[in-house]
């Protein structure tokens, strides 16, 4: 019996408390793409040909971040709504990896997390090519959600206005 009590006390003392992360309210809402900087050069660096770059650039994009429809605390839903394809990432938690279909119609391992209180990250690892890792950084700037991406030294910023 003493061993059991000692074991329980050890687990309680040694095990760090795991606290769920909460997405700051400033990231919640609906944001519609209004403009971008250097996006064509970024798409070239990613290997997209001219026709596909035009299709991607002409696609309207709306991003929605909200508390999860499941009602579970510290869980979220995110939607990418485009004129080409929509994706819905449901019931995820910050720092938790999940697998889902991305805008390129392939399966990705996706993790949303907070780099700091002002920066939300979204990391994608292609399931069929784990060397293809891409991280998007989101920050709020006034009425805008600014998404920054880089690939092989080429960076872009996309500005989504809060609706």
UniProtKB/Swiss-Prot annotation:
Origin superkingdom: Eukaryota
Tissue expression as described in the entry: Abundant in the fluid surrounding the developing embryo of Ascaris suum.
CDD domains: FABP
The keyword Transport belongs to this UniProt entry's keyword annotation: yes
Keywords: Lipid-binding, Signal, Transport
Gene3D superfamilies reported in the protein's UniProt record: 2.40.128.20
Presence of keyword Cell membrane: no
Signal peptide stretch: 1-23
Family: Belongs to the calycin superfamily. Fatty-acid binding protein (FABP) family.
Recorded domain comment: Forms a beta-barrel structure that accommodates hydrophobic ligands in its interior.
Function: May play a role in sequestering potentially toxic fatty acids and their peroxidation products, or it may be involved in the maintenance of the impermeable lipid layer of the eggshell.
PANTHER family, sorted: FATTY ACID-BINDING PROTEIN HOMOLOG 1-RELATED, FATTY ACID-BINDING PROTEIN HOMOLOG 1-RELATED-RELATED
Protein name: Fatty acid-binding protein homolog
